[in-house]
């Protein structure tokens, strides 16, 4: 059932009042909060309909109402207003100590926690497509060669390969030329049988070594990197009464230290709310059990084509969604600027 304008305005008033106060909202509060000029009795009837439709619920201990997950979802998808958040310019602060990517991402998590007053998390970059940038084969000893594989994003993989007989310098040089000529700029799906056949023909009597090197390349491209997750502001969430229950709080704090669950959360793609790549998960939409009383807002940052990571903000379901989305948009613009300048060097 589609809500009429009156119900939408009342629902919006309930949600906004609850976001501000954290207290259940009654009909008298709504009559003062809106310009509908409705009696308390009429508002009560409308609230009863909204409750029956699943947009608001009544806590056991209160006569007022609070938004349900369904109500929050409607608010996030259709009622949020563009909000210009006066966030301090993060760019200079991010660059101040960001001598390497790890430090930059730690700074991102810390500054977001300070600016939003929620818990934050940032993943290290991941790679959607892994293309071969450069290969180098060198001798370790008479029975082994070292294959250095540089992938897109400057990921370096080292593979030791056993060989049946020693390779002289001329042969190693020839192998390096053949490998780089055929493989540079390709990903695993592009290394087909016809290409392998051509490479083996070029390598002549050393075709078996080429096969072993190709196996090493395929393994390097397919390997998953160890994703790092940087968190900050975990204790911020304890400031909100609905999240400071001892048992729930301890589970939530444990989750924020549990890498596997955070990785599942950050890699979850099921959500609406496509706002410049920003995703909003509310209550039961989150894939992590201990976060069913939370809202999670995530965004994707991109360093270069195919190289991306995730940023997440965790708070109560009554979080200031407009501020969080605006802050993330602001941050994404500043990160884009930082990464663009790095790539232009």
Swiss-Prot record:
InterPro entries: GAF-like_dom_sf, HrcA, HrcA_C, WH-like_DNA-bd_sf, WH_DNA-bd_sf, WHTH_transcript_rep_HrcA_IDD. Pfam families: HrcA. It comes from Lachnoclostridium phytofermentans (strain ATCC 700394 / DSM 18823 / ISDg). It comes from the Bacteria. GO terms for molecular function: DNA binding. This is Heat-inducible transcription repressor HrcA. Signal peptide: none annotated. Belongs to the HrcA family. Negative regulator of class I heat shock genes (grpE-dnaK-dnaJ and groELS operons). Prevents heat-shock induction of these operons. Keywords: Repressor, Stress response, Transcription, Transcription regulation. GO terms for biological process: negative regulation of DNA-templated transcription.
């Amino acid at each position: 059932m589609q809500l009429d304008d009156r119900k939408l305005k009342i629902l919006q008033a309930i949600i906004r009042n609850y976001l501000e106060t954290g207290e259940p909202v009654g009909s008298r509060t709504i009559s003062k909060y809106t310009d509908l000029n409705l009696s308390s009795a009429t508002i009560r009837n409308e609230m009863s309909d909204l409750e029956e439709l699943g947009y608001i619920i009544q806590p056991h201990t209160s006569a007022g109402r609070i938004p349900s997950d369904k109500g929050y979802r409607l608010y996030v998808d259709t009622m949020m207003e563009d909000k210009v958040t006066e966030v301090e310019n993060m760019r200079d602060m991010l660059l101040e100590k960001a001598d390497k990517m790890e430090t930059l991402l730690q700074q991102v998590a810390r500054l977001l926690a300070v600016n939003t007053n929620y818990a934050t998390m940032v993943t290290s970059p991941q790679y959607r497509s892994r293309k071969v940038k450069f290969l180098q084969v060198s001798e370790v000893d008479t029975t082994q060669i070292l294959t250095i594989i540089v992938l897109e994003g400057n990921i370096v993989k080292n593979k030791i390969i056993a060989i049946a007989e020693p390779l002289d310098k001329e042969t190693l040089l020839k192998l390096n030329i053949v490998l780089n000529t055929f493989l540079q700029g390709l990903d695993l799906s592009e290394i087909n049988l016809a290409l392998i056949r051509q490479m083996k023909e070029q390598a002549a009597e050393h075709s078996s070594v080429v096969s072993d090197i190709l196996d090493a390349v395929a393994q390097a491209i397919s390997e998953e990197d160890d994703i790092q997750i940087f968190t900050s502001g975990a204790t911020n969430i304890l400031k909100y009464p609905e999240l400071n229950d001892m048992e729930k709080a301890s589970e939530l704090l444990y989750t924020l230290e549990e890498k596997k669950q955070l990785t599942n959360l950050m890699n979850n793609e099921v959500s609406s709310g496509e706002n410049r790549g920003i995703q909003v998960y509310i209550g039961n939409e989150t894939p992590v059990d201990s976060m069913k009383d939370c809202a999670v807002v995530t965004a994707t940052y991109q360093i270069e084509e195919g190289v991306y990571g995730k940023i997440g903000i965790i708070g109560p379901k009554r979080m200031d969604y407009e501020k969080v989305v605006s802050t993330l948009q602001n941050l994404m613009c500043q990160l884009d600027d930082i990464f663009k300048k790095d790539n232009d060097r």
